[in-house]
Amino acid sequence: MHNFVKTLFSVLLLLFCSVLTAQNRMNDARDPNRIWLDSEVTHHGDYQWKMMKAGDITDPGEKISLSDYPTEQWLPAIVPGTVLNSLVYNQKYPEPYYGVNNKIESKLIPDISQVGRDFYTYWFRTEFAVPQSFKGKNVWLQLDGINYRAEVWVNGNLLSTINGMFIQDYINVTDFVKIGKNNALAVKVYPVDVPGSTKPKSWGAAGEFHNGGNGNIGLNTTMLMTVGWDFTFMDGIRDRNTGIWKNISIYATGKVALRHPFIKSELRKPDYDQARETVSVEVINPSTSNSGINCKVKGEIVGENISFEKSFRVIRGEQKLVTFSPDEFPQLVMNSPRLWWPVNKGPQNLYDLKLTVSVDGVVCDSVKTRFGIREITSDTKTPDKSRVFYVNGKRLFIRGTNWIPEAMLRHSDERTYAELRYTRQSGVNLLRMWGGGIAESDYFFQLCDELGLLVWQEFWMTGDTRHPHDKALYMSNVESTVKRIRNHPSLAYYVASNESTEMTGTPELLNQLDGTRGYQMQSECAGVHDGSPYKQVNPMHHYENTASPRGSRVDGFNPEYGAPTLPTVEILREMMDEKDLWPINKEVWDYLDGNGFHLMTTMYTDLVNHYGKSS
């Protein structure tokens, strides 16, 4: 008995420590000097967000964004979140994931293709205080992601418009906020320009199970699977995930600010025993009145006795890129660096880079980023020209999987931590960010760095949909995303699209912004063949190389394949009524079973036909 209690206590202590470690990681991912405007609803934040359909309001943004504007009739809102998430929370619509609630024929949740964009165009609003510690400084409002377009109003002033799902926006609100008093933030959010429909395409190859509906969703730079795909609801998410889907925060700087630090590593071969580091950072002078400011940027690689500095001048309104090269600063040549390795190949060694900018000896701003020193390359020097990856010169056998976002963007750090921990435990070492999904959070990439999980990043184009009609908007979203994620050693490879082509200028832009990672035009070229199988087959077929009718799958690089798996009965009961569980209600099961494949019901039918009904 004593040993049992001792063992039980040890297990509980281990679980507690795991939860505590996860929470510490989540806290580390957030800058404590910022004000994070997370909603009370769902996220347990400190801010009361409200929402109202724009068509139900006649008042202009100048009035809605004043601190005394009445919102008693508005609904509580989830931020970060989507319009539909908030409407479901407020019980305006049923839970989409239950039974056939989301099925377009059920007519329980209006689809944007039928009711129009105005139906899901909403105002989101909250109030916040700016602390006295921000007095005399530049105050910034940072918006990390809104789908799809937005007007940003503060205290009666329209300060910015946002375009595209993956843009980070930094707004100087210094002249528009009141220190120590209530301030109002109102954001009018518009859905994607072209919502598309679930009707099959009238052009080109229809694609398996009509993925992407009529294909028009691809005219936007957004999460393409929201219109429907064969691994989720075939008829899509009703609002196309309209909303403030990522964080909003407020922070302060001095006269100048730092943004987008980047550190490049060039390793000496063949021994990988020396690293030449090149550091760069953007310095912003937001003033429109002064003639220029003399600045000094100081940097250090924390704990390594490596520091460097440079003085320069930034004129008013300038955004200046400041670079520190190892030729100019020999201390940026690191001997015997601690290399970063993927899981099961070595330790995930990480360094911290800290940069500060000062004017007249007063620190105005500081940024900190983590990085790893490693080299990831690939080639097709194999008998069948299949792509092979190398990390620090060592050949790596890829055990990968596609990473598909939760369809309604109900994300949380807790969920991200759990899913990535399970991913590592399963033996996976590479995650493909599929092109119809999203660019994941900073916390996601931080965990991939720590867990040794490589990331293959695609950029929101597929062969099942049309291509973005606004090239400049698409490229600005790519640029914003690359600047955000490029310091992560886990980021291994760029791919422009899923089974399609590239936007002209993409490889040149990636090389300009990064230049340290491989690239290919789409997911099925340059040593990577097409996917499948997408169902369970006799395991021997894999060894015999006959698993897929499309050809060889053993001696090549397969970008995607899949098979159905059944959740536990407890989870199934959260998805449907008891009466639909058994005997199987084919309509319900098919709708929840990836919809395009129906493999669970098909497999059951095949088994019954072969073996007879279960007794």
Roles of regions detected by a PLM:
Residues 1-11, 21-434, 439, 554:
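Secreted/periplasmic carbohydrate-active enzymes, especially glycoside hydrolases
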Residues 25, 80, 199-203, 412-416, ...:
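General structural signal for secondary-structure boundaries
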Residues 109, 183, 466, 614-615:
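Short amphipathic alpha-helical segments at helix-loop
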Residues 393, 608-615:
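C-terminal substrate/ligand-recognition segments
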Residues 430-603, 607-610:
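Substrate-binding/catalytic cleft of secreted carbohydrate-active enzymes
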